[in-house]
Amino acid sequence: MKALKNAGQEEVPSAWKMDLVIYSDLFLVNNTFDELYTYAINLNPAVEMALWKGGKMTAQVILPVATNLSGEMKRIRPGIIALSQDVRFRHNIFGKMTVGNFTNNRYGAQLEIKYRTNNGRWELGGTAGSTGFSAITREDGWYIGRKQRINASLNASYYEPRLNLQFDLKAGRYIYGDYGVRGDCTRHFGEYAIGLYALCTDGEINGGFHFAIPLPGKKWSRKGFFRVKPADYFAWAYGMVADGEYIEKQLGKSYSTRPNENRSSNFYQPDYIRYFLIKELQKEKSK
């Protein structure tokens, strides 16, 4: 309920104010016989700035901390460097356009559009992108490939309010031309989210789990033009299949266009907010 105390007051605008957000990243895969796991631990600070209504700039750098991998994984390299524009149309239709350098060594442009019902339980939409290869190499420095690859998907999401469950279904074309279907089931606990997923693409099956947890310092206030803060959440996903044709053909590959993509950040489902506020009110009454 504390979040509602200042609901009637106008927020301080954050346009053209800069945040330095410190993200952490863990890469962990079991796909070799000579080592139990290949791993990489990185710190990924990002400068984030709201430019105007719906507009945002992100500039991120990846700083390796520890790894048993070689090549690019040991080098300081660019992370997400992007400009994005969110637009809300009439009749609960939302759009987003992003251009720049993304995760998984991709650069290019992506368009997202979705429709949300009045109660927020159903979402239907689509995503389309055109990206090329981007990497830091010893020979070429920052290499930018010219070949573009098309990815696209149709997406559906449903929120079940009684159990606080979110179901997501996505069908489409992944980065390297394979076609597949992915389903996710996520349980929300306050600001925590944990879920399972299954993916079938080009006849290969994969699955795993993902979670997002809030980090201390998430509610740091802003006192000037520049603010340094930790990331709001730590998110991680694990897939069971890490070898064979699934890896050799790079099946099911996708990318993120913003550093804070996870199942908790920007989850503003009306039924869940109502449920969460009722629990907070009951706690205050019981004191």
Q: How should each PLM-predicted stretch be described?
A:
Residues 1-8, 135, 144-145, 151, ...:
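Flexible, glycine-rich linker and terminal segments associated
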Residues 10-19, 52-58, 88-94, 118-124, ...:
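Short loop/turn motifs that connect adjacent beta-strands in outer-membrane beta-barrel proteins
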